[in-house]
A protein has these predicted regions:
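Extracellular/virion structural assembly segments
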Residues: 1-210
């Protein structure tokens, strides 16, 4: 067994999220600055679970053991970040309108009020700046919404960072709730803290797979 989805219970009590943009900065004696970026971006996290009983801890420990340190990628949802702050909700359906190339930061969207796509959606603040989204079904990268998104007669314009990491096709779905990150453990060694009262504490670090 490997991969899979990190258990959702108990939920993380805190999550520290980092946006990483690998760059090389050169400072000349004149004070001029040169920056070379690698045109890639990834998220990394430090997450803490609440004190757990042995029964709560056991399935989490078993899951972590199957990952064999950083070897296998797995999916994780973060209760603090995996859901939109906007007014989109199930069964609203949002799809990409037309093909977009890797590097694009503005994405045209179509939206409907129902899964049958019988009625186009008009909704202010459908998505909010700071939301996290991804594209279905085979695009694992997670992006941040940079500007609020309104939908008028089924159309909307989405601004994201970073730019698209791969080309996307028209009709691909937008995931705005239950967003999952595809990640791997950062450390070879995983440490579980046994506390007074027979509770277990656990903090883990993981990084987005590109």
């Amino acid at each position: 067994m490997s991969g899979g989805t990190f258990p959702t219970s108990p939920a993380f009590t805190s999550v520290n999220i980092q946006a990483n943009n690998p760059s090389i900065v050169t400072l000349a004696s004149s004070g001029r600055r040169q920056v070379k970026t690698q045109n890639t971006q990834f998220w990394s996290f430090k997450a803490t679970l609440p004190p757990m009983t042995r029964a709560q801890w056991a399935p989490i420990a078993a899951f972590i053991m199957t990952q064999r340190g950083p070897r296998f990628p797995f999916n994780v949802q973060l209760p603090q970040y995996s859901f939109t702050q906007g007014n989109l909700n199930s069964p609203h359906v949002v799809e990409i309108n037309g093909a977009h190339d890797a590097g694009d930061t503005t994405i045209s969207l179509n939206a409907w009020t129902d899964s049958g796509k019988s009625t186009t959606l008009t909704q202010t603040d459908g998505l909010k700046a700071g939301d996290f989204i991804s594209f279905a079904p085979d695009h694992n990268k997670v992006y941040m919404v940079i500007e609020d998104v309104d939908f008028s007669s089924g159309s909307g314009s989405l601004t994201i960072e970073p730019g698209l990491q791969v080309d996307v096709s028209g009709g691909e779905g937008l995931v705005y709730d239950n967003v999952s990150w595809n990640v791997f453990l950062m450390n070879d060694t995983q440490e579980f803290q046994m506390n007074a009262g027979n509770t277990v504490g656990y903090e883990l670090e993981f990084r987005e797979v590109l």
